[in-house]
Amino acid sequence: MDVHNVEMVMSAVSASQYPTDGKPEIALVGRSNVGKSSLTNTLIQRKNFARTSSQPGKTQTLNFYDVEDKLYFVDVPGYGYAKVSKAQREAFGVMIEEYITSRKQLRGVISLVDARHEPSEDDISMYEWLHYYNIPILVVATKSDKISRGKFNKAESVIKKALGFDNEDSDFQFFSSETKYGKDEVWHWIEQHI
């Protein structure tokens, strides 16, 4: 998709604050600092539209980005950040669960993992949870520019094995915000699901 018009329309913490115009939504989930904002910025061809931060846990609300008046990207708070209080983690969990299990406009979830590492327990739990609710999933292995292309097959195998990857309802893509590798493939998946 050629993107010229993007607007962050709202930050929400509950269903009463979600957009009401019925546009399809694609949610982005992953650990803190896995690259959700960088993926968003690359997809919409903007450098700093979605705020990136070296400080994990920056996103604390569901951020809705209207893309070309056709769909919303929904940036979900990162999980697994130790310095967030237990109460805050629980509140994030409730907010995310409410959104993912009840939002009819949600067409799919892009679940980000770090290409350099085996998925964390949180990554695995998120994948299993999305799979349980029959939500289409694109697993995006970010920071792929940090590993050689010759190691892609091994990295993909490690990630898929750890997640218990199901080829029936899930897809997989390497991605780099530095080189833009995988950008077109991610857009193709999004367009198939909206």
UniProtKB/Swiss-Prot annotation:
What is a GO molecular function of this protein? metal ion binding
Give me the residues that bind Mg(2+), please. Answer: 37, 59
Is Aminoacyl-tRNA synthetase a UniProt keyword of this protein? no
Pfam families listed in its UniProt record: MMR_HSR1 (PF01926)
Gene Ontology terms: cellular component: cytosol
Q: Disulfide bond: present as a keyword of the record?
A: no
Q: Alphabetically list the UniProt keywords.
A: Cell cycle, Cell division, GTP-binding, Magnesium, Metal-binding, Nucleotide-binding, Septation
The organism's place on the tree of life at top rank: Bacteria
The residues the record assigns to binding GTP are: 30-37, 57-61, 75-78, 142-145, 175-177
Q: Provide the cofactor list for this protein.
A: Mg(2+)
The family database entries (InterPro entries) matched by this protein are listed as:
G_ENGB_dom, GTP-bd, GTP-bd_ribosome_bio_YsxC, P-loop_NTPase, Small_GTP-bd
Q: Which SUPFAM superfamilies would you find in this protein's record? A: P-loop containing nucleoside triphosphate hydrolases
The chain positions of domain EngB-type G read 22-194
An example of a Gene Ontology BP annotation on this entry? division septum assembly
Family, per entry: Belongs to the TRAFAC class TrmE-Era-EngA-EngB-Septin-like GTPase superfamily. EngB GTPase family.
* Physiological role: Necessary for normal cell division and for the maintenance of normal septation.
Q: Mind telling me what this protein is named?
A: Probable GTP-binding protein EngB
Source organism of this protein record: Leuconostoc mesenteroides subsp. mesenteroides (strain ATCC 8293 / DSM 20343 / BCRC 11652 / CCM 1803 / JCM 6124 / NCDO 523 / NBRC 100496 / NCIMB 8023 / NCTC 12954 / NRRL B-1118 / 37Y)
